[in-house]
Amino acid sequence: MKIDGTRTQDRAIELVLDYYSAFNRGDWPGMQALLADDVIHELNEGPREVGLPAFAAFQQRMARSYREQLHDIVVMATQDGTRAAAEYVVHGEYIADDEGLPPARGQHYVLPGGAFFAIEEGRIGRISNYYNLQDWIAKVRG
């Protein structure tokens, strides 16, 4: 018999995997359904955004400028299921200029990334994304 903590841990891992599965399908509403209404989204080298409307605006910016798929996703979670971490490899194409970044010319890139999650009442309450922005810039500049 498994202790409850292990099942809670499994649910946290499944939640994060569901989030990334929705991402890879381009299912923005599906991603949002997994988030708390007051979700905190901490962008790599960017501002902290709070709430589903801010997250939806972020998704629109991403969809306009990038086509991305995440591969080799590995998710770990605390036994109590309140925290999780993910590591992945981003395979992307830069399709339209994003403010403050080099011009887009359909450049392809592959780079590692990761994220940390806080999970509250079965929903994602915080996402902190990390990747090497300078590495990405070097890849798209060629």
Which ranges hold each PLM region?
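C-terminal and inter-domain tail/linker signature
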Residues: 1-142
